[in-house]
Amino acid sequence: MLIVILTSIFSFTPNSANPSSIPALKTYALAVINNERTKFHVQPLREGASISADNQARFLLTQLTLTHLDSSGNTPSKRYALNGETGYVAENLSVYHCGDADACKTAISLAVDDMMEDLESRANILNPEMTHVSTGMAVGNGKVVMVFDFEVRRS
């Protein structure tokens, strides 16, 4: 009985950013990504709809590892098509620990820095053909999950 009581008293639930901070975090992420594009004289991206990206971020928050496949085994392109979108899509994923909105902003900056060090992720960020980025974000359990779906939209 003592073990159960001590476990209850000392169980640790990490702080997480409030889900209401997600819109501001998405705006921040778009600015960080566009800052990288500007450094390389590439047109800034516009904000995408983020429906598929948000769903994937929420799914990934419940998983132990990052994956481009959703709970039904769909790839980013398939999820994008199921959402009624057309065109090319490429996806970058990241997860970082953060306990509040400011720490999550730092995590976003670090995630984009890491992506710029990875050849495929960097190519997605700097691809001049890309026109939009749909940013999915989920916070909980002391972490932020980021899904960046880079899109080529022809209007």
Model region roles, listed by residue range:
Residues 1-11:
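Hydrophobic membrane-insertion alpha-helices, especially the h-region
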Residues 9-24:
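Sec-dependent signal peptide cleavage junction
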Residues 9-11, 39, 149:
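Intrinsic disorder/low-structure terminal segments
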Residues 13-15, 31, 43, 62, ...:
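Generic signature of intrinsically disordered, low-complexity segments enriched in small/polar residues
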Residues 17-20, 62, 96, 106-107:
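A short, structure-level motif marking secondary-structure boundaries and short turns
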Residues 20-81, 128, 133:
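Short, well-ordered surface patches within globular domains
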Residues 75-154:
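A well-ordered secondary-structure block
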